[in-house]
Amino acid sequence: NTHLRLEADNFNLDGFDVAPGKKSKALVMTFKRPEEVVGNHIAKYQALRLSKMLMAYDFDRKLCAFAELGGFIFTFMGDGKPGTGKTTLIQMMAGMIDGYCKVAGYPFRYQNLGIDTVDSYQGKSGQNAKSFITSVMDPAVIGFGTIDDIDQVAGKRGERGSSAGQQEITAVLMEAFAGANTVVRGNCTFGMFSNYPENVDDALRQRAG
C-alpha cells in the first residue's frame, strides 16, 4: 500500500494499492531444465516450441509474427492424473522463457491464479482475476500466466456446488480468452491445468487452444 502526506494541508492518504503491472517482483521459482523432464515428450515439445514462439514478439510493433500469421497458442490446457508432471511442465516452461528473456534483455512476468483468488466478497474474485489477466497481458512484457487446478478456481455455470466467486472468475476468463475485445498480441500465453478437466465449464474448456 502507498502512504502519502500533504504537508501544506496536514492531510494523510493511506491504503492506495499500486496499479497491477506497475510494480514487479523478482521471480522466485524452482525451475526445471528440459533434460530433467522425463516422459510425456509431446507436451514437453509443445511447451518448448511455445517458449520460443514468445521470443518472436516485436516490442516496437507490439505484435508477434506467429500471432499475425497464425500458429500462436494463446491458451492451452494440461490435464492428467495426479503425479503425471503438470507442475513440472509449468516449472520447465517458466524456466525456459525466463532464460530466453534474460539473454534477450526482455522483461518477463509470470503469475499464477490460485485458489486464494476466490473471495467471499461480492465482485472481489472477478476483480482479482481481471488484475491477473491485465498483468500478464501487459504489452510491455513477455507474460506467462497459469491457472493451476482450474476446476477448483473457476466454477461451472449453473452448478449448485460452484460459489459466486468461482463463477465470477469463469466469466472473466471466458471474456479475456475469447471475448469480443480480446486482442492476441503474441507476447503472452495462458496455461490451464487440472486433474479433472471434465469439471471445468464446457465453454471455458473449449477456449483452451
Task: For each feature predicted by the language model, list its residue ranges.
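Substrate-gripping "pore-loop 1 plus following alpha2 helix"
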Residues: 125-131, 158-188
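Walker A/P-loop
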Residues: 68-110, 134-135
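A short helix-turn-beta junction within AAA+ P-loop NTPase domains corresponding to the substrate/partner-engaging
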Residues: 202-209
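Interdomain "pre-motor" coupling segment immediately N-terminal to P-loop NTPase/helicase cores
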Residues: 1-30
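Pre-Walker A (pre-P-loop) alpha-helix and adjacent loop at the N terminus of AAA/AAA+ ATPase modules
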Residues: 29-74
